[in-house]
Curated annotation (Swiss-Prot):
The chain crosses the membrane at residues 7-27, 33-53, 71-91, 105-125. It is found in: Cell inner membrane. This is Fluoride-specific ion channel FluC. GO terms for molecular function: fluoride channel activity; metal ion binding. It comes from Gluconobacter oxydans (strain 621H). The lineage of its organism: Bacteria, Pseudomonadati, Pseudomonadota, Alphaproteobacteria, Acetobacterales.
Length: 144
């Protein structure tokens, strides 16, 4: 692990953290009873991005990128942006305030939406990859 790699992850994490803060502030009005601002725009979007980018940028994907770019986006940016630790604390706060129903909704919605978002990101990028492979195969066949 080089200093450059650490720097790449650190910068991505800083940008992801700043984005998380800005989105959290903007989502405060809708987060009065259940922390929807954390669930939807942060954890679900971050999960979609990591699934989409991770699939689209594989070596055999439509847009392969360097390992450093994957580290920047997937570990740095998404790691700083998504907030599982915040989700856990918010859920514990709901439980400590005897809001078990709201805590249960928070857990279920977070898990279901985030796993669904990763799957949707993967499926969407896989469609891009498959389309790129078909286009490349058609072009190769036409050249032959």
């Amino acid at each position: 692990m080089s200093f450059t790699t650490c720097l790449i992850v650190m910068v991505g994490g800083a940008l992801g953290t700043l984005a998380r803060y800005l989105v959290s502030v903007a989502a405060m009005p809708i987060s009065r009873f259940i922390p929807w601002g954390t669930i939807l725009p942060i954890n679900a979007l971050g999960s979609f991005v990591i699934g989409f980018f991770g699939t689209l940028t594989l070596a055999d994907g439509r847009y392969p990128v360097s390992e450093n770019m994957r580290l920047f986006v997937m570990i740095g940016l998404c790691g700083g942006y998504t907030t599982f630790s915040s989700f856990s604390l918010q859920t514990l706060d709901l439980i400590r305030n005897d809001a078990w129903g709201r805590a249960s909704v928070n857990v279920a919605a977070s898990v279901i939406l985030c796993i669904g978002a990763v799957a949707l990101g993967h499926i969407t990028a896989d469609g891009f990859n498959t389309g790129a492979i078909r286009i490349a195969q058609t072009a190769t066949e036409e050249d032959a």
